[in-house]
């Protein structure tokens, strides 16, 4: 017999508070977790659903720098935005926390100090880029330069967006600091490392213990890392935004916890905050430190090793040498594959996405929940398309479920006074043609095995059966010759409505509650579910007795989606795909068309010199022009250049440029220009400077 734990803790990967969540996030993590939690609640289980925002890390500080605001303002904005979008979508968190909060900071520091006290961390000195102007060390994403592979300028220190190559900052050609545009210097810095290899054997045993119940992708990702051997992993960074190290030593100054270490601890700190709101500050321990709790971590496949290796290793380090206050490890880590969008991967950086909040401004949440549940990326990547969304809403939700519910209630209201016209005994219920015990057994197995697409499809199949039953029974005809038979048909139909309301509640909760209300019940299904009350089993049997009074009115559960409703979205896709094609074309070699041939003597007439920009200012009433004061050896020149759209005056000062020194003077916008500086035009039309490097080259010839 399967052991049923006393309680279940469900956590969801923390979305990064640096932008809005999109449908890919919803499909991979938050909707499946919510469906599972709602199912468990229906079964009467003690289950809590914990989520929240990951609010630390470099991308947040970069966004803050770009917008001229504080990191706290960035995370405040996106935490609120995402929390509201989740609530509107019916994602039923028991608590949605923030890693920037005091309880989380305290929890993360407690873990650090406990592991530090045991002497587990390893300290290492390494070389890292340092911005001499800004006076701070730079993380990968604060460094930009030319990609060594495709030679595209503007590559980040961790990856080139143009060719996709993963990089380290030291590989960049001509690296620059994004903070000051200064050339960074390699300097030594000290960091704390977590020795993952110390727990290699324990982690191998942990993964192997779950090979029979974890998804194959989770096991395979974990084994790949284990087979390579687990290395030490840095847990600190030189950064101003984050959780500062709780040490007074000089070497700890300016260090914060690396986000991979602190974010997963949010599951624990958020459970603590939830417990405080329940009036019992120690209640969280029952969900984290009791073997009678089953812990489920819902994540996407890109987060697997953080939850199967790194987070467990942190908990193992805490537990080491302890007999009390030991943390339990996850029972399952149902990691999904990715959901793509119209054949391509979701991409925030390229704005190729459908954001949850924006979607819900146009379409009901339940239509999205159903469409994604039927396309859940369990074992392979799936694709969200507007046409599939339209077809499922119209053909399955509106024409099948919605049609059956409305016909059943409308006919009862009009011909039977809005009351259930007959009692349905179990014999009649079981003779409908559905093996209820077998059907429920399959549904329970699907939910318990995290097969949400299968569970959704089976539930819709019961709706199809109900719709066929009503259509084939033709009570609108039978009532003319046998009112009692028509009454029995409607009693069966109404009880099927009752069953469907309960079965669909995990998938489309708002719709289920609307059906519940039309059936004449007070309150909502949400108010029925509580530990120890197995509402789920009520769907097995007829739940409406003869004489039960319906609400007396019905409503259309789902409006059909017309072509004109999704046409604007399709046009957006066309525009985004056109942009993508342009980017792809930019990667291809540019066809060369050369100017007419000149002789070597002609070329020798051009005098190219290295000049340094000593001052720069905009040209009045000229949006494209900058006025540069150049030092060319012992001479000073004034040059006007059409680069104002790509460089600020502040960025230009101090740069070396290539000057055409013997170009005839000319006047532009009333200003004298004594030459021209050389630039290169990129595929997107952006201009890049030619910047000679080296000491003592000012005024020298370029050849």
Curated annotation (Swiss-Prot):
One Gene Ontology term from the biological process aspect of the record: methionyl-tRNA aminoacylation
E.C. number: 6.1.1.10
Cofactor notes: Binds 1 zinc ion per subunit.
Chief place of localization: cytoplasm
Keyword Ligase appears in the UniProt entry: yes
Cellular component GO terms held in the UniProt record: cytosol
Reactions catalysed: tRNA(Met) + L-methionine + ATP = L-methionyl-tRNA(Met) + AMP + diphosphate
Pfam families linked: Anticodon_3 (PF19303), tRNA-synt_1g (PF09334), tRNA_bind (PF01588)
Superkingdom field: Bacteria
Top-level enzyme category: ligase
Role played: Is required not only for elongation of protein synthesis but also for the initiation of all mRNA translation through initiator tRNA(fMet) aminoacylation.
Subunit text: Homodimer.
Matching PANTHER family: METHIONINE--TRNA LIGASE, METHIONINE--TRNA LIGASE, CYTOPLASMIC
The name this protein goes by in its record: Methionine--tRNA ligase
Organism: Chlorobaculum tepidum (strain ATCC 49652 / DSM 12025 / NBRC 103806 / TLS) (Chlorobium tepidum)
């Amino acid at each position: 017999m399967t052991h049923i734990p006393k309680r279940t803790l469900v956590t969801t990967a923390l979305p990064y508070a640096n932008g809005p969540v999109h449908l890919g996030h919803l499909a991979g993590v938050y909707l499946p977790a919510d469906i599972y939690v709602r199912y468990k609640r229906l079964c009467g289980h003690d289950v809590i659903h914990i989520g929240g925002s990951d609010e630390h890390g470099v991308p947040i500080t970069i966004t803050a720098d770009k917008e001229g605001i504080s990191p706290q303002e960035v995370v405040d904005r996106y935490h609120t935005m995402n929390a509201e979008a989740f609530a509107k979508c019916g994602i039923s968190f028991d608590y949605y926390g923030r890693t920037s909060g005091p309880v989380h900071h305290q929890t993360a520091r407690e873990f650090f100090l406990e592991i530090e006290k045991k002497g587990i961390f390893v300290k290492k000195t390494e070389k890292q880029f340092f911005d001499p102007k800004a006076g701070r060390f730079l993380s990968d994403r604060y460094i930009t330069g030319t990609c060594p592979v495709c030679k595209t300028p503007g590559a980040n220190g961790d990856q080139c967006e143009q060719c996709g190559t993963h990089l380290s900052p030291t590989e960049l050609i001509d690296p620059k600091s994004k903070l000051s545009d200064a050339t960074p210097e390699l300097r030594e810095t000290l960091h704390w490392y977590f020795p993952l290899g110390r727990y290699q054997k324990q982690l191998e045993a942990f993964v192997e213990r779950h090979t029979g119940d974890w998804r194959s992708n989770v096991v395979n990702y974990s084994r790949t890392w284990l087979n390579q051997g687990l290395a030490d992993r840095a847990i600190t960074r030189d950064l101003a935004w984050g959780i500062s190290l709780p040490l007074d030593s000089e070497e700890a100054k300016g260090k914060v916890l690396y986000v991979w270490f602190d974010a997963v601890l949010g599951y624990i700190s958020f459970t603590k905050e939830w417990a405080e709101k329940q009036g019992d500050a120690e209640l969280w321990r029952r969900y984290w430190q009791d073997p009678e709790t089953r812990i489920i971590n819902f994540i996407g496949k890109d987060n697997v090793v953080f939850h199967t290796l790194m987070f467990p290793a942190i908990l193992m380090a805490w537990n080491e040498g302890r007999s009390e206050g030991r943390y339990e490890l996850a029972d399952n880590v149902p990691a999904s594959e990715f959901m793509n969008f119209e054949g391509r991967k979701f991409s925030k950086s390229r704005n190729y996405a459908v954001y949850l909040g924006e979607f819900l401004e146009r379409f009901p949440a339940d239509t999205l929940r159903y469409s994604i549940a039927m396309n859940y990326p369990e074992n392979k990547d799936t694709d969200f398309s507007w046409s599939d969304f339209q077809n499922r809403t119209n053909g399955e939700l509106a024409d099948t479920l919605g049609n059956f519910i409305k016909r059943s209630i409308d006919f009862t209201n009009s011909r039977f006074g809005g009351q259930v016209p007959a009692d349905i005994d179990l014999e009649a219920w079981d003779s409908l043609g559905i093996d209820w015990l077998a059907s429920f057994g399959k549904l329970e197995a699907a939910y318990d095995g995290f097969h949400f697409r299968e569970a959704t499809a089976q539930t819709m199949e019961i709706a199809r059966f109900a719709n066929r039953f009503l259509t084939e029974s033709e009570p609108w005809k039978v009532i003319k010759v046998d009112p009692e038979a028509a009454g029995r048909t409607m009693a069966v139909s109404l009880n099927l409505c009752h069953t469907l309301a309960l079965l669909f509640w995990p998938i489309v909760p708002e719709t289920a509650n609307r059906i519940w209300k039309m059936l004449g019940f007070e309150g909502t299904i949400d108010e029925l579910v509580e530990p120890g009350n197995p509402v789920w089993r009520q769907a097995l049997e007829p739940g409406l007795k003869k004489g039960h009074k319906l609400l007396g009115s019905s409503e259309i559960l789902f409006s059909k989606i017309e072509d004109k409703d999704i046409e604007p979205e399709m046009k957006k896709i066309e525009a985004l795909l056109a942009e993508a094609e342009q980017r792809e074309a930019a990667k291809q070699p540019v066809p060369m068309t050369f100017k007419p041939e000149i002789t070597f003597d002609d070329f020798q007439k051009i005098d190219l010199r290295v000049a340094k920009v000593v001052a720069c200012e905009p040209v009045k009433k000229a949006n494209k022009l900058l006025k540069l004061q150049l030092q060319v050896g012992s001479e000073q020149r004034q040059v006007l250049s059409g680069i104002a759209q790509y460089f600020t005056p502040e960025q230009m000062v101090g740069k070396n440029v290539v000057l055409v020194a013997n170009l005839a003077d000319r006047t532009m916008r009333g200003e004298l220009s004594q030459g021209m500086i050389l630039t290169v035009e990129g595929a997107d039309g952006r201009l890049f400077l030619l910047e000679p490097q080296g000491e003592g080259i000012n005024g020298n010839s370029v050849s």
